[in-house]
Regions:
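Ligand-binding pocket scaffold of soluble enzyme catalytic domains
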Residues: 1-184
Length: 184
């Protein structure tokens, strides 16, 4: 595979980390998500995508838990991705951005969690692609997770999933300004 020397990670936290650092929940977003899982997204001015679940007195109670949500590696909301400047070329990565995997995303999240001083997460939760990240956490870093809550996900795609995603890919490529993905 390819290697990125360093990367930026955009993230948000909600609630307070307790003194023992045992109340942290990592929320992993789906493909079209971002770090704004709760409260108002400052860019869209809309409620976070899981605002109904995360907050004071809600299912993931931020009066009890410290919630961390990062934009994944390769995302487009502040973490290093195709729109980022490649330090070697001083231009956007664009199509030259390395192919990344769920495992790569989770390795970056683990570095973030460690940088926050958290040795073991109370839980990791995510749906769809976020659920795949949750499963990766449960296998790769099982010693750093108490509870894994994968939602609407699988450890691999079915033929139907692959076909569905191909339809989406074809729709993007049919856009008149597609330019073979060369946006930069």
């Amino acid at each position: 595979g390819e290697y990125i020397d360093s990367c930026e990670v955009a993230f948000k936290t909600f609630g307070e980390l307790n003194k023992k650092k045992t109340n942290a929940i990592l929320v992993c977003h789906a493909l079209s998500g971002d770090q704004f899982c709760s409260e108002i997204n400052p860019l869209t001015k809309k409620n976070g995508w899981w605002n109904i679940l995360i907050g004071p007195g809600k299912v993931i109670d931020t009066n009890v838990f410290f919630v961390v949500c990062s934009n994944v590696l390769g995302g487009c909301m502040g973490s290093t991705g195709p729109s980022s400047i490649n330090p070697k070329t001083k231009t956007n990565y664009g199509l030259k951005f390395p192919v990344i995997t769920i495992s790569d995303m989770v390795k970056v999240q683990e570095k973030l969690v460690s940088a926050l001083g958290i040795k073991k997460l109370f839980a990791v939760i995510g749906g769809s692609m976020g659920g795949m990240q949750t499963l990766e956490w449960a296998t790769r870093f099982s010693n750093k997770v108490n509870v894994a809550i994968p939602i609407a996900t699988s450890y691999r795609h079915s033929a139907q999933n692959i076909a569905f995603h191909e339809i989406g890919r074809q729709a993007i490529m049919a856009d008149p300004v597609w330019n073979k993905g060369n946006y930069y």
